[in-house]
Amino acid sequence: MRDRYPGSPDQSSVASVGFALAALPIAVKNAWVEEDVARSRAEGTLKTFKNLKNYSGFYYHFYSMSTATPSSGSEVSVIDTALFLGGAITAGEFFGGNVKSLANELYERVDWNFFTKTNANGSKQFYMGYNATTDTFSGAWDYYAEQLIMYVLGAGAPKSEYRIDPRMMYDFARNKGTYGDGEPFIYSYFGSIFTYQFSHAFVDFRDKVDENGVNWFENSVNASIAARQYCIDNADKYATYGENSWGLTACDSPSGYNGYLGGQPSGYKNESRQSEGTIAPAGALGSIVFTPEYSIAALRHYYEFDDLRSRYGLRDAFNLANRNWYAEDVIGIDKGITVLMAGNYINDGIVWKYFMQNKNIRKAMDRLGFTEV
């Protein structure tokens, strides 16, 4: 799965592959692809990943599609591996047979403790990246973001020696705030809306609370409503923003890719939020399970712009305040979250159904302390 199109023709994004694998059941259910063809794609992809260079089961962020080797400068990434496994497990449960066997094999070989750091106070967190050349780790998942699926996969590891301490899910900062008169929610560092979506594409957090009583699904509902209101309140500053054009998220922008776009509240200084008028349709569309009415209204609005359409649906982003700028590319992870959330909304939670039926995932939810409400 390419990272983007038409740009970077040789670069594959591991997270995008995960989204693509989980999209195959959606494609089959909607008769977009024959089941045998989809199964063959899934099996071929997993066979390729079985032989890709990895460390303790963790994959690099990017690989060359022509050589199947890590892209230059790419780090080994825990979150991208987790999103890939989310798709692999979903496809495995849907297709069964060799696809399921391969998915289980790839999941089984991941040593989640390899990426774990223990702090002086005894708390544990995942590192963000690993540089195999220097044998050093970088960053830490010490703040709420898109990483919840990592704890689910780590707690459900098929091999007990590779399994994380479930308390890790409670060892990152859970700061709560509000935007305007909205409901409070645990917010992410940059306030980017994708951080409230990615794990939710796979893990069904509906009607569940963790040991601290947090309903993560409702948390994303409140975050999505806040993201929309933020754009409504700033529509006088940025022509792209409005009640049907919202959801600041990492995306292409007139100045290049920007991973820091987001709304309030956020862990970073709110007065320094990067809000430069660019909107990615994936922001609002990725929240369709949280705010269906608002997200569908946004989709209808976006399709009014002829220049925003492309071979693969809506382009990655646009900015009406900057010479009516439209992105040239579509990006794999942005298309991925759009398709998976649409599938969950339209096809009765199809990705949730197959990911959550995996026996290791069910055990993980119990180990992490989730209960039904």
Q: Which residues does each predicted region cover?
A:
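Ser/Thr/Asn(+Pro)-rich, low-complexity disordered segments
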Residues: 1-373
